[in-house]
Amino acid sequence: MSLGWLEDVAWNKEGLIPAIAQEDRTGQVLMLAWMNREALETTVQSGYAVYWSRSRKRLWRKGEQSGHEQIIKAIHLDCDSDAVLLLVEQKGGMACHTGRHRCFFKRLEKGNWASVEPVLKSPDSIYNNSDE
């Protein structure tokens, strides 16, 4: 496949683009992460979500430690070409490193952020494999 489509992406000055992962089955927004050119290309080639970690300065395949992979169903580029939407099948039922289904679990209620989704599995058990 030609990679000319990558030239249509409006990368920011750091060479990144925000990537929204949305659950294909439910339509729920799971998370927001960042992709560089290599991450987006690898995602397309592998069929699994691969992001760029701004803190670790490296690629990371979603689920590489937890097993909670995201299988790509479709990829959309927004009207300004500066954000991508990944429609995914979320494996393991959790997208958030906090052990919740999605990262957007805090809702503003009366001037305070309230956690409105339960922890499905403790992060310690996810990343230390202590209960597997």
Swiss-Prot record:
Cofactor note: Binds 1 Mg(2+) ion per subunit. Binds 1 zinc ion per subunit.
Disulfide bonds: none
Listed pathway(s): Amino-acid biosynthesis; L-histidine biosynthesis; L-histidine from 5-phospho-alpha-D-ribose 1-diphosphate: step 3/9
Reaction equations catalysed: 1-(5-phospho-beta-D-ribosyl)-5'-AMP + H2O = 1-(5-phospho-beta-D-ribosyl)-5-[(5-phospho-beta-D-ribosylamino)methylideneamino]imidazole-4-carboxamide
Keyword Magnesium assigned: yes
Binding site for Mg(2+): 78, 80, 82
Its EC number(s): 3.5.4.19
A biological process from GO: L-histidine biosynthetic process
An example Gene Ontology molecular-function term: magnesium ion binding
Cofactor: Mg(2+); Zn(2+)
Any one Pfam family match given in the protein's UniProt record, by short name: PRA-CH
Enzyme superclass (EC): hydrolase
One Gene Ontology cellular component: cytoplasm
Keywords for this protein: Amino-acid biosynthesis, Cytoplasm, Histidine biosynthesis, Hydrolase, Magnesium, Metal-binding, Zinc
Binding site for Zn(2+): 79, 96, 103
Function (record text): Catalyzes the hydrolysis of the adenine ring of phosphoribosyl-AMP.
UniProt subunit comment: Homodimer.
PANTHER family the record matches: HISTIDINE BIOSYNTHESIS BIFUNCTIONAL PROTEIN, HISTIDINE BIOSYNTHESIS BIFUNCTIONAL PROTEIN HIS7
Protein name: Phosphoribosyl-AMP cyclohydrolase
